[in-house]
């Protein structure tokens, strides 16, 4: 019986209980709060990384945009930790589900757009019709700008889903090929196993980069509307 390549993306269930809830809540354990007066190396490294990322993301924002700092940092930690947990054996990655990513992207995008129309109504409407547009092109340009606006959350969610899913499928395929080649050619199996290790390391980087890209784009949407 052929194995379904997408079986690893099905939500695992034990005793009738879906594990996705525990997997989504578990990342908070990866970032513990130290009660010591002098932080250990892990907590110090964690704080340094958070300060570095927050400085890069919030440097473009004004005083109103700075109020979104906590939300953006929580978002990048949530996406990054769930992506990393999905690389563990027999685990499930929630960010491979388009429904979940749309559930994150649409409210964040809608909040940014509504904030822009409330605080900068004229500037927000001006995005639909750039200055100097020829009169015959005005109706078409307004339609194009409207479509591009509403496609932003879809592109945001699809980008994250596609990148995470593609990496997991490659790991699954190369891992299966390695197991199949072990009984045929040990040398070839070692080569594919080396490729598998390198690809896994690359996926760790992709998991963090995609969390950064998702949060950075949300930050840019907020910057355009605050």
Swiss-Prot record:
GO biological process terms on file: proton motive force-driven ATP synthesis; proton transmembrane transport
InterPro entries, per the entry: ATP_synth_F0_asu (IPR000568), ATP_synth_F0_asu_AS (IPR023011), ATP_synth_F0_asu_bact/mt (IPR045083), F0_ATP_A_sf (IPR035908)
Catalytic activity: H(+)(in) = H(+)(out)
One GO term describing the cellular component: mitochondrial inner membrane
The protein's assembly and partners: Component of the ATP synthase complex composed at least of ATP5F1A/subunit alpha, ATP5F1B/subunit beta, ATP5MC1/subunit c (homooctomer), MT-ATP6/subunit a, MT-ATP8/subunit 8, ATP5ME/subunit e, ATP5MF/subunit f, ATP5MG/subunit g, ATP5MK/subunit k, ATP5MJ/subunit j, ATP5F1C/subunit gamma, ATP5F1D/subunit delta, ATP5F1E/subunit epsilon, ATP5PF/subunit F6, ATP5PB/subunit b, ATP5PD/subunit d, ATP5PO/subunit OSCP.
PANTHER family: ATP SYNTHASE SUBUNIT A (PTHR11410:SF0)
Protein's job: Subunit a, of the mitochondrial membrane ATP synthase complex (F(1)F(0) ATP synthase or Complex V) that produces ATP from ADP in the presence of a proton gradient across the membrane which is generated by electron transport complexes of the respiratory chain. ATP synthase complex consist of a soluble F(1) head domain - the catalytic core - and a membrane F(1) domain - the membrane proton channel. These two domains are linked by a central stalk rotating inside the F(1) region and a stationary peripheral stalk.
The family this protein is said to belong to: Belongs to the ATPase A chain family.
Name the record gives this protein: ATP synthase F(0) complex subunit a
Organism expressing this protein natively: Bos indicus (Zebu)
